[in-house]
């Protein structure tokens, strides 16, 4: 088989295609969750924090003060931008929780489908098994 033929066989296997679809859908889903966090959850958090949330929280190393993280970075001052890290952790936690709920729901549906499926009918014994059963019964007598 040629190199291109091997690659085509590899790329068209079910697992690779499923993985590609999963990555694409996962990227789109990540954007949805990020929007949910940025546009719906963080405004509520900012009500209690009194500002725009965590993203712009930072600590400047030194005696200077800056009104925003962008201005501190522009000045080239070393900063400890802990707010962006906290925001990323919140995004990840919400994304992981939503995915967990989706997987849990899918597993529950799968269990219900398996429970609702009729039990398989036992197969008829083969002629060989019937003959062996008859021989066993004759030997017992």
From Swiss-Prot:
Transmembrane stretches, by residue range? Answer: 16-36, 83-103
Q: Which InterPro entries match?
A: Mechanosensitive_channel_CS (IPR019823), MS_channel (IPR001185), MSC/AndL (IPR037673), MscL_channel (IPR036019)
The reply to whether Cytoplasm figures as a keyword in the UniProt entry is no
Tell me which GO cellular component terms the UniProt record holds. plasma membrane
Keyword Transmembrane helix annotated: yes
Q: What assembly does the database describe for this protein? A: Homopentamer.
Could you tell me which HAMAP family the record lists for this protein? Answer: MscL
NCBIfam families in the cross-refs:
mscL, PRK00567.1-4, PRK13952.1
Record's family? Belongs to the MscL family.
Protein name per Swiss-Prot or TrEMBL: Large-conductance mechanosensitive channel
Q: Which organism is it from?
A: Cytophaga hutchinsonii (strain ATCC 33406 / DSM 1761 / CIP 103989 / NBRC 15051 / NCIMB 9469 / D465)
Encoding gene, per UniProt annotation: mscL
């Amino acid at each position: 088989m040629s190199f291109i033929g091997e690659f085509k066989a590899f790329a068209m296997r079910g697992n690779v295609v499923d993985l590609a679809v999963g990555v694409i859908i996962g990227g789109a889903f990540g954007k949805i969750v990020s929007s949910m966090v940025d546009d719906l959850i963080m405004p509520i958090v900012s009500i209690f924090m009194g500002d725009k949330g965590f993203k712009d929280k930072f600590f400047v190393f030194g005696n200077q003060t800056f009104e925003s993280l962008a201005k501190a970075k522009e000045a080239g001052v070393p900063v400890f931008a802990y707010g962006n890290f906290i925001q990323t952790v919140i995004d990840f936690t919400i994304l992981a929780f939503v995915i967990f709920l989706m997987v849990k729901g899918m597993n529950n549906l799968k269990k219900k489908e398996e429970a609702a499926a009729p039990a398989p009918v036992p197969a008829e014994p083969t002629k060989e098994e019937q003959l062996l059963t008859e021989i066993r019964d004759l030997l017992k007598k």
